[in-house]
Every structure is written in structure tokens, then in C-alpha cells.
């Protein structure tokens, strides 16, 4: 069973995947969470990455190995992608919540 923050994170990952973002990093996911959940308190990056780690342990997301040539400055970005199981779980969550409106799939 997922906790609410894990559900929100998984739903945001699904929304990104549906518009073509097969891989995503924390900043993009946090931006999507803010777009989708304007009435709830923003999730901190540390909470977001803990959720991603737990979702990864459950096989719902997969951390993509870093590409050493893709980023030359700053801290290394951790990239993730939905697994097939994660996609299925997120779609089930969205249906259960009645999240079939255009607002749910809206991107910033």
C-alpha cells in the first residue's frame, strides 16, 4: 500500500509519461506536482526523493544509470522512469480517484 505522497508522486510521473517524458528528474517531477496539486502543500525535494526511493524499491519506478557525458556542471541529477508495473498502478490510482479530467493531465 502506498502512502499519499507516494501516490501523488506516481500520478505526477504518469502525467509526465503521458506527454512524452519517458525519463524525469526531481525538479521536473516537483514542477508537475505543483501543477497538479495546487491546493495541497508543496512537497520538499527530500520528501520527493524518499518517495522515489520507496517507489523504486517496490518496482514502480526505475532509476536510470547516469550518463557521464550528459551533464558537466553542478550536482548529478538522478533520472527515473516508470516501470510497466508503475504505469499500471498509476493508471489504477487515477481511475480510482476519478482523475480523468483535462486538469489532471495538465502540464505547466
Predicted regions and their residues:
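Beta-hairpin "wing" of winged helix-turn-helix
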Residues: 58-74
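Short alpha-helical segments that sit at the start of domains
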Residues: 1-24
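Amphipathic alpha-helical dimerization/coiled-coil segments
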Residues: 85-108
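Basic amphipathic alpha-helical segments that dock to polyanions
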Residues: 48-58
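Short coil/loop residues immediately preceding or within conserved phosphate-binding loops
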Residues: 77
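Accessory beta->alpha helical hairpin/"wing" motif in late/C-terminal subdomains of nucleic-acid enzymes
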Residues: 66-68, 80-87
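DNA-recognition alpha helix
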Residues: 25-39
